[in-house]
Amino acid sequence: DVVTAPPHDGDFSSFKPDWSKYQVVVSNYDAPDARWSDSLKASFEEYVRNGGGFVAVHAADNAFPQWKEYNLMIGVGGWRGRNEKSGPHFYYQDGKLVPDQAPGMAGSHGARNPFKVVNRVTDHSITKGLPREWMHVGDELYANLRGPGENMTILSTTWSDPANRGTGHEEPMLMV
């Protein structure tokens, strides 16, 4: 079953999914905060709080920069005005997680290129059985993401190459 949000200029007043019908919501939603009503946000928060699964894919980290609970769900996000006030820029350096509080905007990516993904947590049910390192096909490598990062475990990272407008850090690629 698929629930699709109304188009860009569509009417969101009738968009009221029954989240409880789903074990997991997979989202690539990227639009301004104002489109979701407070009641729609509250129903989604309740769904997740009650154990509903939520997978934020690709541009879903751009959505809802002002929605505190959403940002707690995704851990880190980019664009749409996020900056140091949104939370630290999390990355790995010398094998350690760095919550960098330096000022700056959130969200960047270079040109689409293949990149190596490193699974840092190999005993998690999501990464168990996967190779420690593997190549991802050409794609945008999101970097410089910021957010509260509370209760966030970074399972995999990717080197954000400065030669491709990257940060020069091991950026989070897969988080739970």
Question: Predicted regions span which residues?
Answer:
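Aromatic-Pro/Gly-enriched surface loop or interdomain linker
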Residues: 1-22
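Structural recognition of the beta-strand scaffold that forms the well-ordered cores
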Residues: 2-5, 23-28, 48, 53-58, ...
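Solvent-exposed loop/turn segments at secondary-structure junctions
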Residues: 8-12, 30-35, 54, 60-64, ...
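A generic local structural motif
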Residues: 11-14, 41-42, 140-142, 172-173
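A conditional alpha-helix N-cap/helix-loop micro-motif detector
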Residues: 15, 34-37, 168
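Extracellular/periplasmic catalytic domains that process cell-envelope and extracellular macromolecules
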Residues: 17-21, 48-50, 64, 146-149, ...
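A glycine-rich, often tryptophan-bearing local segment used as a flexible ligand/cofactor-contacting loop or short
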Residues: 34-125
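Catalytic beta-strand/loop cores that center a nucleophilic Ser/Cys/Thr
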Residues: 89-176
